[in-house]
């Protein structure tokens, strides 16, 4: 197994069954709700928090799928077999169903759970089929949360951290298309167009903020390539990011700087470098080969990838519990495999 992927898998194995330290996002309705992470979340109790545990499991699946028969295959399979069981998922579903938890992990953790589901659905392997069947009840719960949330979301959430809506819409859309959930696909496409079709002059020069791990501008552009026909997307991108260079330069977008990698908030900027890189590649992939912006998009992506992957070293758990998932999404080109835009039947569109 090549570097750095072996390092990433090792980092996932080091955290998916590591209960502490742990930051729980938990509403207590009574004394009985004061429980340990493993009691609250029988499957996703590791990796410091619920969403990181979910994408840690996704990372193991992704690396098993893209790099089979590596030295860590047995350990990764055993960890997934232990955690992704019907019994454990029943506990996760019960947690979601309890009073006061309608907004639990919305939307970031929900998006990663659907990404895990999409990965398992795509992989033609007996292990994937076993794990996919196990998480199916939680998949249904989470996709239903999207359905109840999006009609009531009046405005996009344009921030660079967990609550950002563009990232969650993109991953949710990828799952809906893979799962054949036309209702959710239509809802996400309609909401994305309503939020963003008229957006202009995104202020990317103001990015990043001091604790970002997602670029508001680039994640929106990465979403919209999924929901617009190619010609429409070209015109939209011209207006949305009009200053992308056409000379092949990379210096138009400078990577984020982390001065203290032991600070759980400040280390977010290592993540923004990784997620910027995959978004830049996604935007470039949506442009025709002759588009002169492609070179500058890919040059900036390469710089961000180099800086970002170097930061994924596991030296501190503040970044070690999650950065490898971002790096895996990037280096395995997961985003470039997103199901393509397609015209939806009119009867499927929300009124």
Where are these regions (language model features)?
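Loop-centered beta-sheet repeat module
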Residues: 145-220
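Well-ordered alpha-helical segments within folded domains of soluble proteins
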Residues: 52-63, 106-121, 163-177, 212-226, ...
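Solvent-exposed loop and edge beta-strand segments that line ligand/cofactor-binding
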Residues: 1, 38-54, 94-110, 152-165, ...
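Terminal, non-catalytic domain-edge segments
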Residues: 1-15, 22, 66, 123-126, ...
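Extended ligand-binding groove/face enriched in aromatic
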Residues: 54, 63-176
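Active-site-adjacent bridging/hinge elements
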Residues: 26-35, 88-89, 141-147, 196, ...
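HEAT/HEAT-like alpha-solenoid repeats
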Residues: 10-13, 17, 21, 42-46, ...
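Low-complexity, Ser/Thr/Pro/Gly-enriched N-terminal "stalk/linker" regions
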Residues: 1-45
């Amino acid at each position: 197994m090549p570097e750095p992927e072996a390092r990433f898998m090792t980092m996932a194995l080091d955290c998916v069954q590591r209960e502490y330290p742990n930051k729980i996002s938990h509403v207590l309705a009574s004394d009985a709700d004061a429980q340990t992470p493993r009691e609250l979340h029988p499957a996703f109790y590791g990796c410091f928090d619920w969403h990181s545990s979910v994408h840690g499991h996704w990372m193991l699946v992704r690396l098993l799928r893209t790099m089979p028969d590596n030295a860590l295959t047995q350990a990764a399979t055993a960890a997934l077999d232990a955690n992704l069981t019907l019994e454990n998922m029943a506990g996760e579903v019960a947690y979601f169903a309890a009073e006061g938890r309608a907004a639990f992990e919305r939307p970031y953790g929900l998006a990663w759970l659907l990404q895990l589901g999409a990965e398992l659905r795509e992989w033609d392997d007996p292990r994937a089929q076993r794990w996919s069947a196990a998480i199916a009840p939680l998949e249904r719960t989470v996709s239903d949360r999207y359905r109840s949330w999006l009609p009531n979301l009046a405005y996009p959430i344009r921030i660079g951290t967990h609550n950002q809506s563009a990232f969650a819409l993109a991953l949710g859309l990828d799952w809906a298309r893979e799962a054949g959930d036309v209702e959710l696909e239509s809802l996400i496409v309609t909401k994305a167009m309503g939020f963003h079709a008229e957006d202009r002059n995104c202020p990317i020069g103001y990015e990043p903020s001091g604790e970002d791990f997602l670029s508001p501008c680039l994640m929106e552009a990465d979403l919209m390539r999924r929901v617009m026909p190619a010609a429409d997307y070209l015109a939209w991108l011209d207006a949305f990011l009009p200053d992308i260079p056409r000379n092949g330069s990379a210096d138009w977008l400078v990577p984020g700087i982390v001065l203290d990698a032991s600070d759980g908030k400040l280390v977010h900027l290592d993540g923004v470098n990784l997620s910027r890189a995959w978004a830049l590649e996604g935007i470039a992939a949506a442009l025709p080969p002759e588009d002169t912006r492609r070179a500058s998009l890919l040059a900036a992506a390469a710089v961000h990838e180099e800086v970002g992957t170097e930061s994924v070293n596991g030296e501190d758990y503040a970044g070690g519990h999650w950065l490898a998932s971002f790096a895996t999404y990037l280096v395995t080109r997961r985003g470039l495999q997103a199901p393509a835009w397609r015209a939806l039947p009119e009867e499927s569109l929300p009124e």
